[in-house]
């Protein structure tokens, strides 16, 4: 996956229109742009009629090639507002190779003051837009935008979705020949179904013939303005072949839209919020007296991207998750609940410096860039042992605030002091039991209690492990207030929040005791010395009594491959029997449906990356539950799938 971001290179003509240097063409006609969009994309696909006939909670999925300035999205959203049921939903998926930066986007959308109700929410969330899948949520979850940042022929093959309406846009074939190819049309067909419709400006003969070959029935129709003719069509080809059954979509749960979420930390609150935004009534069962009492309860967590220069599944998820979390944080109070103060990772040895150099060469400077020591000290506000890698969009978060914000949806009910010990499936409903007491029941359950998901028999074989971590709370001093960014080496220290710095965090693979220890406080103070002797002196660490220090310990929960475990759960024994042939030939794809435990899902294993991966994993769970486009590339979603471990056991003969 390419990781370098190329923003659109734009010139502005004397009429205020953006002109693309890449394609030597304007994005839209200055006087007729909106009317052209309404005629070609909204009118020819009969979108108003489609929206008007949407049932409550039903979702229309629009796919687009070429997001550009977002005009088509804004017009579709406006039409949706005008015609759709208040409980219906719109999911808009668009590919863009050269996204506009924030300044250019803001300048472009000012040309349409009549669309301000739709352009302003995008501008508010238009942050951390990096290569890959980037998801946005608007109108309380009624509208979802998934931007695929990159080349259309690299991004669309990774999309797992079923598109209802195609806006085949992008610059004209003569200006953008690399996009208009049979490979593109094959992807449109793969993602379509009988009844999918398509609109496009182009009437080029070979484009029409290629679309027909791909399975679309196309026709020319009267155009608008200077465009005499345009094209519309419908998909009449065959359904695509099924994917491997162990990664196939479970049947969408029918009946009442009610769900249980077990656990009210980051994973649980994110799962609950994503379902509630889709019209589900969610009951969250939490064993403690309040949400965010375990690993999600630390005073400050670091929004830090530990990436690979090689585009691994984990790196792709981190890029997508980071953007999604940053957009969610815009709703919280900066300074109290979070701060985009940046994160500086020190190059503490030669190996780390080499790693940072490779990352800086692989990613956009707006995401990360190397700093020399003097530059790093100027940003951090304290003396440092060297330079490092700076993430300007990173920062710190108060995790309980994010959990509470997600749980405030009116469709969510949190019930505390509910320690679920057992699940039973009775009459298409899952029942949550504590001994002989029935706590709650619903057709859908999401297990989000970190390593505690192992207590439930369907998850017992998941290879989750707990790692104890302890943070230390240090009272801020007048001179320690100078720290202006999170600084990391082997540990991390954050700028003060409510008069305290958070310092951490230890890693203990053996202890099961959650009482903070003096030894680990001392270990954290040693980590602070490695980060900045100057800051340690400003905090008067030498005068602190480790036995009097405050802190907290919790368990991180992680998987062997460091990816979270997110998705539907299958019956482990039936799974092993159904696909036993893989033990003899891993290339086999048996034509046997996966034995799903209908309505049961998991969201766990986020390790120390929960702030980045858990919120987007809530969206991933909701997409599995509701049959919506996945918010991650298909291969990344599969890399997070619970079935990956059962497959590995079969293939390795264990």
From Swiss-Prot:
Protein name in UniProt: tRNA 5-methylaminomethyl-2-thiouridine biosynthesis bifunctional protein MnmC
Region of interest (tRNA (mnm(5)s(2)U34)-methyltransferase), residue spans: 1-236
Disulfide bonds: none
Species, as recorded: Pseudomonas putida (strain ATCC 700007 / DSM 6899 / JCM 31910 / BCRC 17059 / LMG 24140 / F1)
GO BP annotation list: methylation; tRNA wobble uridine modification
Keyword annotations: Cytoplasm, FAD, Flavoprotein, Methyltransferase, Multifunctional enzyme, Oxidoreductase, S-adenosyl-L-methionine, Transferase, tRNA processing
MF (Gene Ontology): flavin adenine dinucleotide binding; oxidoreductase activity, acting on the CH-NH group of donors; tRNA (5-methylaminomethyl-2-thiouridylate)(34)-methyltransferase activity
Family: In the N-terminal section; belongs to the methyltransferase superfamily. tRNA (mnm(5)s(2)U34)-methyltransferase family.
Reaction(s) this enzyme catalyzes, per UniProt: 5-aminomethyl-2-thiouridine(34) in tRNA + S-adenosyl-L-methionine = 5-methylaminomethyl-2-thiouridine(34) in tRNA + S-adenosyl-L-homocysteine + H(+)
